[in-house]
Amino acid sequence: MVKGLYDNFLANVEVSEAITDNVIECWDKYKTNSDNTIDVTSTSTFDGLQSANALELLDFQEDYKFQGALNNLLEIVQHLIRTNLHYYWVHFVEYHSGGYQGIHNHAHNEDYSLILYLNTCKGGQTHFESGVVCTPKKNNMLVFQATLNHGAKETQSWDNKKVLVCGMRISK
């Protein structure tokens, strides 16, 4: 992991609506395929739907819009932190009303994480142990070191909160 300048790195960037729309279109199309989702009881997700690693799911591997969106997101992050990265894990989380994410981090698998908000909703703020709180707003993307403990507050909207979560490793 990069030390010094990027310790406790956290950025909130807006991405183009076209990228977000391509991602949400794919999720909405493929989430009904039970091969693409997992049982959330072994995760930090409560009252929601979660995909398996989309990098390993045929529906997502073969979707050129999704792959293009992933490439665009990776370029944005690499430009932001000035480091070459590659994806290790990519998954979707959709929270129902009352759904939330327990405090966790991604340090066991990744160097950097991103959360792309696929829609705007009430509640469901991403919160960090440092006290930083980010409200879900469509097209906003959080980029942070995987060591940062974070969670998602309870979703209070009738519209499900939808996010894309990506884990990246530094390319050697």
Describe the predicted segments one by one.
Residues 1-83:
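Non-heme Fe(II)/2-oxoglutarate
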Residues 75-172:
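Catalytic core of non-heme Fe(II) oxygenases with the double-stranded beta-helix
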